[in-house]
A protein has these predicted regions:
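Active-site-adjacent substructure of cysteine-protease-like catalytic cores
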Residues: 7, 22-32, 68-122
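Low-complexity, compositionally biased segments
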Residues: 20-23, 39, 106, 122, ...
């Protein structure tokens, strides 16, 4: 079994467990570093994403295509999932654990009327390594629509890493602009709560995780300082102008440093033609 080795990496550990089924021995952090995950930022609608939140075929194939695999996604209605899984082990899907979060698990087959899953977890966690769920229990943890991911073998092909990297600096600058606009205007508690996930998470949670993965301590420490200032304000649940209480200049300096690192990686890949 492959374990989670960095924060929120259950889908990347799940990908490692899918590959393990096919005889490919790799860890989630190796996948992340190979595809330059710490330097990738993206936007989906109003939400910005980075690090372990970049998941699914678009991102997993950056690693998979060069080694001869493709990530297939099937979008199913909740009622279709159980019958589909029976014929398609191994397969990865997300179980709803709270109204705000899901946890990626890997279906490995059925036993005694139960559905068995690898529970992608940290090695030192006391959680079970295998989840066994009845059909009723499984359905209770599924969204109305479920994406099930599987691997198929293909001929090795180049990845789209260059394009994904090239777009990241612009996305990060757009995120910086939105954060500054948001922080310098009075915001309601509801707006602050939404921004915590849509605007701040890519830097102050997943961004810190990615910098720690790189052992890049200085910008990570600065971002942790800003996070420590921000979270009590949002938890207080009061209308506020965030820039009056957080060090926006420190945050902007950290973003600029992060942006410079991404540009350096983009230049390296352009000059060397490096690709996974």
């Amino acid at each position: 079994m492959k374990y989670m080795t960095f924060n929120a990496s259950c889908s990347y550990a799940g990908l490692a467990n899918l590959l393990d089924w096919y005889g490919v021995d790799v860890e989630d952090r190796v996948i992340a570093l190979k595809i330059e995950l710490p330097y990738l930022f993206a936007r989906e609608g109003r939400r910005y994403l980075s690090g372990p939140m970049l998941q699914g075929a678009e991102w997993f194939d950056l690693y998979l295509h060069p080694i001869g695999f493709n990530f297939i996604e099937r979008r199913l209605e909740r009622a279709e999932v159980c019958s589909f899984l029976k014929d398609h082990p191994p397969a990865m899907l997300g179980l709803r654990v709270t109204p705000e979060s899901k946890h990626a698990v890997v279906y490995t087959g059925g036993r005694g009327g139960e559905y068995c899953f690898i529970n992608n977890k940290r090695q030192d966690s006391t959680e079970p390594e295998t989840l066994r769920l009845t059909e009723t229990a499984l359905l209770s943890h599924l969204d109305k629509t479920v994406v099930v991911g599987m691997l198929e073998k293909i001929g090795p092909r180049p990845s789209a890493l260059h394009d994904r990297l090239a777009g990241s600096p612009g996305v990060l600058l757009a995120l910086q602009s939105e954060i500054n606009d948001f922080c310098t205007q009075q915001q309601t508690p509801a707006a602050q709560a939404a921004a915590l996930n849509d605007l701040f998470r890519p830097l102050l949670l997943d961004g810190i995780t990615m910098l720690e993965l790189l052992e890049d301590t200085e910008p990570a420490a600065s971002l942790r300082t800003v996070r420590a200032q921000l979270l009590p304000l949002i938890r207080a649940g009061r209308p506020t102008v965030l820039s009056e209480s957080i060090d926006l200049s420190l945050l902007n300096a950290s973003i600029r440093a992060y942006h410079d690192r991404i540009k350096q990686i983009c230049l390296y890949h352009t000059q060397t033609g490096a690709n996974p």
